[in-house]
Amino acid sequence: MDDRLEKIAKVNYWNGNRFDSGVERTWYLDRIIPYTGNRVIKVVTGQRRAGKSWLMRQVMASMLKNGVMDPSQILYVNKEFYRFSFLHTTDDLMDLYETYCREINPDKKSYVFFDEVHNIPGWERVIDSLSQDPSIDCEVFLTGSNSKMLSGELSTLLSGRYIEFEVQPFSYREYLRTVHSSPSRSTMLDYLQSGGLPEFINLRGEETKRHYVESVKDTILLRDIVERYNIKDAALLNSIFAYLVNNGTSLVSVSNVVNYLNNEQSRRNPKAKEKNYETVSNYIGYLTDAFVILKADRYDLKGKEILKGAAKFYANDNSYHNYLFDGFGFGQGALLESYVYQAVRRAGWKVYVGRVQNKEVDFVCTDHDNRLYVQSSWTIEDEETAEREYSALESIDDSYPKIVVTMDDIARKNRNGILNIQAWNLEDYLVKLSARYNIIQG
């Protein structure tokens, strides 16, 4: 066998190898599997450590189990693994594929799974060739940790011949399956504290957990952003990340961030050069491209349009709040709001923040002609808080679903058609609503 194939055989299925594929992520499998069996490229994106590689293994396992292919038909390439360090150029990549076809799978269709292969310059043309060359019988799956992998040359080459699936950290329901528990206020409190990074959940000891979250953050910032964009000021990037994570429930503009950074800098070093708007704006864009920060634009309910300027920015996982920035006052209500945003977005909605008659609507959620309006409040047991949350939704003059999500032990009765959903029941509600509106969940 070719030396390169011997190196990578241990992470492939050719010799009867079987691999642990973790907690089955049925939401994503139910979306991806129906798109198999054709030349459409399946692209799995999402932040690092969200479980993309595990999901790829689950897709392979599902297809093997259902007899779609046999082990020799799979070629798995993970550019993050040292055993693939011989891959430097597109010629290396194509030569590996051709050698695999010659020695392992000469007669049947190939299913090629590329993990983080976008680190090879010019990789787009290899993907285009494998998926479109009529002399090659091949189906391609990709993962990537940056939303921009689908822009530029790849988008031009493929021109609609791909479908993207964004993977997020474990949902609350997936978390429950991992810890073998059931929905309750207690388990929701645990989830709000831990977040949903798959490998984090089984860690023990607060210091171990903190170090893990720190390493995930550093890897994303340094490898997916600093190295990719040749950033000179990694400390500035980290400061912007910290600011956005800890202001997730407030409207934030680029100017807000610039002013904060310059004020902090002038206290420490009055002679230092001020941060400029363009640099800060670019860095914020890099953070959202890497999926570690999620952006919720403002939506004008009266004019029915997306507004430019200030927006809300949420961390992609609550562990960033809880294990990296102890010095910031990030309360329970903010953790719940972050979770609600993540859950609704994961359920397939486009999520915005809105106002109506000078009242704040936490989330305006859209999917084509469908709408969902959501308020998030830790408790509405006192009448003043309940009035604030309900009155904003009552000011919206349409018949789309409206809900208030809380952590209250006892849910309030419906008020003018507005439901009070306890946080631990939110995802079940969203599943039913998505089925009603035929929304594809993420």
Residue ranges, per PLM feature:
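Hydrophobic anchor at the beta1->P-loop junction of P-loop NTPases
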Residues: V44
